[in-house]
């Protein structure tokens, strides 16, 4: 149900986006970078990596949501770079690095966000659990030949 324009605030600025857009789509439209791993244009939103978390709401009612799955709403307040958001992203990077410490993508993200130590025991997997390959196989190849264990 796209078409109608919705006005809301993103990082203190009043912005508009089409009804049906996600927060991530609106952020990309306005040139705001939000990190993602599981998001892939053309695939259904998944929200599995949680790197794209943003904070919505004000004060005590503020909460973290996945920007790739959360639709824009009239009058909502979105913040993409609060201390809480950055801390959540760092934690997710730390968890993912513990799963696949050899991943160049994760090493780059860890460097970008200043994650220098991992408190969790490494598993040394190849898969970073972003879900992209599973969704591409299911949605674009119509095969459903692979999945998570």
Where are the language model's segments positioned?
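Generic signal for short, ordered secondary-structure residues
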Residues: 5-6, 31, 115-116
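Intrinsically disordered, low-complexity segments enriched in polar/charged residues with Gly/Pro
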Residues: 1-2, 42, 133-134
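Eukaryote-biased recognition of intrinsically disordered, low-complexity regulatory segments
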Residues: 2-13
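Fe-S ferredoxin-like electron-transfer domains
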Residues: 50, 54-149
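N-terminal cofactor/phosphate-binding cores enriched in small/glycine residues
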Residues: 12-74, 87-88
């Amino acid at each position: 149900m796209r078409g109608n324009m919705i006005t809301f605030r993103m990082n203190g600025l009043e912005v508009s986006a089409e009804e049906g857009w996600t927060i991530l789509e609106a952020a990309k439209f306005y040139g705001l970078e939000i990190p993602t791993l599981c998001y892939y244009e053309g695939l259904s939103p998944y929200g599995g990596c949680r790197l794209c978390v943003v904070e919505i709401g004000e004060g005590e009612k503020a909460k973290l949501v996945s920007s790739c799955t959360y639709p824009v709403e009239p009058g909502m307040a979105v913040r993409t770079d609060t201390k809480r958001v950055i801390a959540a992203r760092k934690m997710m990077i730390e968890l993912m690095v513990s799963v696949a410490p050899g991943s160049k993508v994760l090493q780059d993200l860890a460097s970008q966000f200043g994650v220098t130590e991992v408190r969790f025991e490494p598993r040394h997997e190849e898969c970073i659990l972003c879900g992209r390959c599973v969704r591409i196989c299911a949605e674009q190849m119509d095969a459903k030949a692979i999945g998570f264990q």
